[in-house]
Amino acid sequence: MTKQTEYKRKPEWLKIKLNTNENYTGLKKMMRSKNLHTVCEEAKCPNIHECWAVRKTATFMILGAVCTRACRFCAVKTGLPTELDLQEPERVADSVVQMGLKHVVITAVARDDLKDGGAAVFAETVRAVRRKNPFTSIEVLPSDMGGVEENLKMLMDAKPDILNHNIETVRRLSDRVRARAKYDRSLEFLRRAKEMQPDIPTKSSIMVGLGETREDLIEAMDDLRANNVDILTLGQYLQPSKKHLPVLKYYPPAEFAELKEIALSKGFSHCEAGPLVRSSYHADEQVRSAKEKTAEAK
């Protein structure tokens, strides 16, 4: 057996129990009927069955289903995006009502074709959800919106409950993994978000298994903490197709536990770490934990 073949074989701890009960099928039908997209489907998230069938949660993906970037880890389609759908914010808000969500995550494809990076529609989606669901906490997961401060301000002025922006990988691998996004630009984005709205928790995520070292990961944690990021998620990279970057290492659960302890020792208010953890995984629990610790610190 070659080393490359060995890398492609998933270990036991990554095997997922599929659950397609009425919650799952009902949620899928609702998304289709409202012409909405979820990152759960578009990015081939391994937790879709747990979230849709058991937890009845979903991460809405706005601004279309075609991304202007072509990150080498991501399964979302790339190309020329469609025109903006200005009715999308209301449909998302109505879906949150229909689902009875206590916490909603709203993400988007990168829209480098737009001057504001999609910030106006993103902000309006937050406001629409807030109007119709005043007791639902709202987490936003935008791209870097070109690193333009005015675009970020537009989104932060809508007052989401949590701002999530992923650095995705360590500094040493960033240019290879996501060539059109920049590591330092993402850190700056997170720093500015905290400066604009100090009471809104910030969050970021790192994939592992792309060739990073323990030292690389610790450096990334330090970089995030230096920019006042509150919450960290760590999960296993899984290759979506043969066209994407290969998995170079499968981290066992015990190693994720070690990384979580390191992250918490760095001062993160919450760290979710595990083979199947993704940025939005158990997001409601993450934001609740962060807010409780912020309140305790005051």
From Swiss-Prot:
Which residues of this UniProt protein bind [4Fe-4S] cluster 1? 40, 45, 51, 280
Give its E.C. classification number.
2.8.1.8
Q: Which reaction does it catalyse?
A: [[Fe-S] cluster scaffold protein carrying a second [4Fe-4S](2+) cluster] + N(6)-octanoyl-L-lysyl-[protein] + 2 oxidized [2Fe-2S]-[ferredoxin] + 2 S-adenosyl-L-methionine + 4 H(+) = [[Fe-S] cluster scaffold protein] + N(6)-[(R)-dihydrolipoyl]-L-lysyl-[protein] + 4 Fe(3+) + 2 hydrogen sulfide + 2 5'-deoxyadenosine + 2 L-methionine + 2 reduced [2Fe-2S]-[ferredoxin]
What Gene Ontology cellular-component terms does the record carry?
Answer: cytoplasm
Binding sites annotated in the UniProt record for [4Fe-4S] cluster 2: 67, 71, 74
Matching InterPro entries, A to Z? Aldolase_TIM, Elp3/MiaA/NifB-like_rSAM, LIAS_N, Lipoyl_synth, rSAM
Annotated Radical SAM core domain ranges read: 53-269
Indicate yes or no for the key word Iron-sulfur. Answer: yes
Protein's name in the database: Lipoyl synthase
Q: Which gene encodes it?
A: lipA
